[in-house]
Amino acid sequence: MDSKKGILVAIGGGSCSGKTTIADMIYQLLRKKLKVAILPQDNYYKPYKNKSMAQRKAINFDHPDAFDWKLLWSHLDNLLMGKTVAVPMYDYVNYTRKKETIEIGPLNVVILEGLMPWFDERIAKLCKLKIFVEATGEERLIRRIERDWERGRDVASIIKQWREAVSPMYEIFVEKMKQKADLIIPWSERHEVSTNVLDFAIEHLFRKHVDPN
């Protein structure tokens, strides 16, 4: 019998594809009956504290090497064992980790949301359900400009990063995540049906996990 007390649901997809929106919709439904939390993959960027601001700005944050996979896997494993972890917080202005952390756990369901949440094989093996959210490149770019503008970025730098890192990394790494996804959801403004189905499916997966009979 699996010794883990919780289950992991991973939601992946390109930058600004709607992953966070869908993760939050599922969370709002599940929280009424289970202990659940969203764990953003972005929180597990490497800290790069020994690099200058100019060096940190030059990092390709859309490449798998930008993430601290070992820490992420360790935290997920502990959460699924029913433990509490101190989740790092990411500072988007200074391109590093914040000093403060957030404690989460114990949980029934962990929702891991990010660009390529099951890229690491250790994490892929922990997943009970892998969901890929798909949106057109044009739609994702428009949302990216809107989002990063609100974070204090200028449009020229946003488009430059999109051309040099975001778009090519999507083609090389992120899009390939679809091959191992259990479910692919095309983005639309209305997701009530799909999220309600996922709510039912995830609850069923958890109940089956804790009581296989």
UniProtKB/Swiss-Prot annotation:
A biological process term (GO) from this entry: CTP salvage
Ligand binding (ATP): 13-20
One Gene Ontology term, aspect cellular component: cytoplasm
Statement: the UniProt record of this protein carries the keyword Ubl conjugation: no
EC number assigned by the record: 2.7.1.48
Subcellular location(s) per record: Cytoplasm
A GO MF label: uridine kinase activity
UniProt cross-references to NCBIfam families, sorted A to Z: PRK05480.1, udk
Entry's family note: Belongs to the uridine kinase family.
Protein name in the entry: Uridine kinase
Source species: Mycoplasma pneumoniae (strain ATCC 29342 / M129 / Subtype 1) (Mycoplasmoides pneumoniae)
